[in-house]
Regions:
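A residue-level detector for the "anchor" residue at the start of short, highly conserved motifs
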Residues: 3, 7-243
């Protein structure tokens, strides 16, 4: 299934090259891709003045004509957006599961391919969400509200939320608020570019804590989780095994 804002041809532009030579990209390519590799974050300025921070293992795709006739882009992974206001040209984030439309706002959009849910947290402004899995009316979010979409059922749930932690990853922080160990492992793998395997008996175990990616090593994080969650870990065959 192709999203409505995907073009046919893609130009992969490294982050540094994008900043230094965005005006010299050949016109026979229709799309620009900016990607944050595992273990890194990326910040970019879009042509309309909007700012985007990409979390580890994420990427955005947008047209070279972004901001002229439309402001559509696609997101894979997680990004925090500060959208420049433009009443005439709405800003749209397109994914297979849900599309988001705004005029100007600040929000966090999390939708990794191996996640079971899509999560959108609104900091400022107002956003309209269109379900891409099942037909329903647009859902609107106000500040300090969060939408969670189940990728299997298409169910969208809106709730009040403390969104101040939604984008702390921009500051190299990890915050786990009673999250499932399996979900924590996914974040750690992306943040530290490592492989982690969780024993089936631990998949429903939860953990609360916070860490600094640039100060705490992966071993320190796993040691803290192990000491409070009644579990062990070992490094074997190029991966960490939690048991």
């Amino acid at each position: 299934q192709r999203q409505m804002c995907i073009r046919d041809r893609v130009l992969l532009v490294p982050f540094a090259t994008y900043y230094q030579g965005k005006h010299t990209v050949k016109q026979n390519f229709s799309d620009i891709v900016v990607e944050a590799s595992l273990g890194t974050h990326t910040k970019l300025n879009l042509p309309d003045g909007s700012l985007v921070w990409l979390n580890a293992g994420s990427k955005v795709t947008y047209s070279q004509g972004f901001g002229v006739d439309d402001r559509k882009l696609t997101l894979e992974g997680e990004g925090y957006f500060e959208v420049a206001h433009n009443e005439k040209v709405p800003f749209e984030v397109c994914t297979k599961e849900v599309n988001l439309r705004v005029l100007g706002t600040k929000f966090n959009f999390k939708n990794y391919s191996n996640d079971e849910e899509v999560m959108i947290s609104l900091v400022e402004g107002k956003v309209a969400l269109q379900n891409g899995i099942k037909a329903m009316e647009e859902l609107y979010l106000e500040p300090n509200e969060r939408m969670v979409l189940n990728k299997l059922t298409g169910e969208m749930v809106k709730s009040k939320a403390n969104v101040e932690y939604a984008n702390i990853w921009r500051d190299n922080k990890l915050f786990f608020d009673e999250e499932l160990l399996e979900d924590i492992a996914k974040k750690l793998m992306r943040s530290y570019d490592v492989r982690i395997e969780v024993a089936d008996s631990l998949r429903d175990r939860r953990f609360y804590g916070d860490f600094m990616i640039n100060k705490n090593t992966i071993e320190e994080v796993l040691e803290a989780i192990a000491s409070t969650s009644r579990m062990n870990y070992r490094y074997e065959n190029g991966k960490y095994i939690l048991y």
